Regions:
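Conserved alpha-helix/loop element of class I SAM-dependent methyltransferases that forms part
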Residues: 2-21
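Conserved beta-strand/loop positions that form the S-adenosyl-L-methionine
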Residues: 28
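Conserved glycine-rich SAM-binding loop
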Residues: 31
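Class I SAM-dependent methyltransferase SAM/SAH-binding core
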Residues: 34-66
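A short SAM/SAH-binding and catalytic strip from SAM-dependent methyltransferases
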Residues: 79-92
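A short glycine-rich, Lys/Arg-flanked "PGG" loop and its adjoining helix->strand segment in the class I
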Residues: 93-104
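Conserved beta-strand signature within the Rossmann-like core of class I S-adenosyl-L-methionine
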Residues: 105-113
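Core SAM-dependent methyltransferase catalytic element
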Residues: 125-136
Length: 136
């Protein structure tokens, strides 16, 4: 069963790739690549990046391009960079470095469903999702 959160992200992804084919989408912190098949079906190239070598191996076996963050080429021409549920990772530095991977009109899409760090008074059902940055 697909969770509400994944459905929500897929909906935003669909709007980002709408009317496009052949975009390069990099999923930073991809895990098992929950969006890989969906993006492939829509005609886009999916690249998974994670520190979990087992997860990367599973994605590779399914025919997807994968990289460990330490071995990431700088010339991939990424159109959409996905940064989801990054947890304790220093997000600010990732955003700075991520912009270097993007094409001129590339987009960083960041979301977090962990609810940690929400201002007091916000319910856990509040989810912050936004297009964070345009490359260039």
């Amino acid at each position: 069963m697909i969770s509400k959160n994944i459905k929500l992200v897929k909906g935003v992804l669909d709007s980002l790739v709408e009317d496009s084919k052949g975009l390069v989408v990099m999923d930073f912190g991809c895990g098992k690549g929950v969006f890989a098949e969906h993006l492939k079906e829509l005609g886009h190239k999916y690249i998974g990046v994670d520190i979990d070598r087992d997860a990367l191996e599973g994605l590779s076996e399914r025919g997807f391009t994968t990289y460990h963050p330490d071995n990431l080429p700088k010339d991939l021409g990424v159109d959409i960079l996905l940064l989801g549920n990054m947890g304790g990772i220093e997000t600010g530095m990732h955003l700075i470095n991520a912009r270097k991977l993007l094409t001129y009109e590339g987009v960083v899409f960041m979301w977090d469903f962990s609810y940690q760090g929400l201002p007091k008074g916000k319910s856990q059902s509040t989810v912050a999702m936004s297009v964070v940055s345009k490359g260039g």
